[in-house]
From Swiss-Prot:
Compositional bias per record (Basic and acidic residues), positions renumbered to this chain: 110-123
Family statement: Belongs to the GINS1/PSF1 family.
Intracellular or extracellular location(s): Nucleus
Protein name (database record): DNA replication complex GINS protein PSF1
Organism: Phaeosphaeria nodorum (strain SN15 / ATCC MYA-4574 / FGSC 10173)
Length: 210
């Protein structure tokens, strides 16, 4: 039934809004909807073919009704596709502003572990979304570069504690802080200034200890 697949895609988008992470791209649903639109467009062309450019809706209301239904189905499918991609785009842009490397977290371009050597982990992003994130991140970096003294992607709320205890969840190498350099190795703990590690916490490298 026309519109049923598009409805599933909208439900997927609604669930995505409530999730803290981005689920895998619904490539099968998207392709099915695109094929449906093309089928409808072919039906419209086939219906209008005998009339040429002289179709009069008032003279043939049944044909006009069929054309209207097909047209509305195509429009609805398009709107559902746009809504789905808008939800995912807004989430991706939000990750960029929060300093979260979504490409790394989704395993894009990385080899799997545990007997999966030589195979790449499946990314939750489509190839187009991965390219969008790269270009958006480049634009954001260029925009932030104009104000080097201000972290435009930082939290708008001041930290409650100036210094915090953190545990390293994964190796992050050496970082420079206001009080010198520290090497972040997995499972190590540090008492550091909140502002120096805020971005690393958001990226999942560190865990704040209560």
């Amino acid at each position: 039934m026309y519109g049923e697949t598009a409805n599933k895609l909208v439900q997927n988008a609604k669930r995505t809004q409530a999730l803290p992470h981005l689920p895998p791209y619904a490539s099968d649903l998207s392709r099915t909807i695109v094929r449906e639109v093309r089928d409808l467009d072919r039906d419209v062309s086939a219906i209008l073919a005998p009339y040429g450019s002289s179709f009069n809706p008032s003279a043939d209301p049944s044909t006009a009704c069929a054309l209207l239904v097909n047209h509305l189905c195509m429009r609805r499918n398009k709107r559902c596709l746009l809504a789905y991609h808008k939800v995912r785009t807004e989430k991706l842009e939000g990750y960029c502003w929060e300093g979260i490397d979504i490409l790394e977290q989704t395993g894009s371009g990385k080899e799997g572990e545990g007997g999966m050597a030589g195979k790449k982990e499946e990314s939750s992003l489509s190839p187009e979304e991965e390219e969008y994130v790269r270009q958006y991140s480049d634009l954001l970096a260029a925009y932030k570069g104009q104000w080097t003294d201000i972290d435009l992607t930082g939290s708008l709320e001041p930290p409650r504690d100036l210094f915090i205890d953190v545990r390293v969840l994964k190796d992050a190498g050496e970082i420079q802080t206001e009080y010198g350099s520290i090497t972040l190795t997995k499972n190590s703990q540090f008492y550091v200034r909140h502002g120096d590690v805020e971005r690393l916490i958001a990226q999942g490298y560190l865990q704040r200890l209560s």
